[in-house]
């Protein structure tokens, strides 16, 4: 199962890299979100995919699952959601001002020529 998750994380990284290298600002933002999801999947895989009970003291559970990777990923998901929403608002504002989401048109003119 870990191999399948690692391959899936690699595919997500490839798609994110493709989107990050495009000229459209919206594609770059989607690529950034995909990259963060790939990192979340990689962290989950590195934490180990084990079956077990919740880490609550009880007499019936014999093996426990480590809660640290899940807590780390949950925190990273919340942070990436906040950053993505902030970047989307900034991109919308730039689109309102410039009437384009093309990265080459957003650069402006070079005044040193």
Swiss-Prot record:
Q: State the oligomer form and interacting partners.
A: Forms a heterooligomeric complex that consists of seven subunits: MrpA, MrpB, MrpC, MrpD, MrpE, MrpF and MrpG.
What UniProt keywords apply to this chain's record, in alphabetical order?
Antiport, Cell membrane, Hydrogen ion transport, Ion transport, Membrane, Sodium, Sodium transport, Transmembrane, Transmembrane helix, Transport
What's the domain of life for this entry? Bacteria
Membrane topology of this protein: Multi-pass membrane protein
Gene, per the UniProt record: mrpC
One GO biological process term is: sodium ion transmembrane transport
Protein name per its UniProtKB record:
Na(+)/H(+) antiporter subunit C
Query: Which PANTHER family is this protein grouped with?
Result: ANTIPORTER SUBUNIT MNHC2-RELATED
């Amino acid at each position: 199962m870990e191999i399948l998750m690692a391959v899936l994380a690699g595919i997500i990284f490839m798609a994110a890299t493709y989107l990050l290298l495009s000229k459209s600002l919206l594609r770059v933002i989607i690529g950034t979100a995909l990259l963060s999801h790939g990192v979340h999947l990689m962290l989950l895989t590195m934490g180990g995919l084990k079956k077990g009970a919740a880490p609550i003291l009880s007499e019936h559970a014999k093996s426990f699952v480590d809660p640290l990777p899940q807590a780390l990923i949950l925190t990273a998901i919340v942070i990436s959601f906040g950053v993505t929403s902030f970047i989307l608002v900034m991109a919308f504002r730039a689109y309102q001002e410039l009437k384009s989401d093309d990265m080459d048109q957003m650069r402006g003119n070079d005044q040193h020529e």
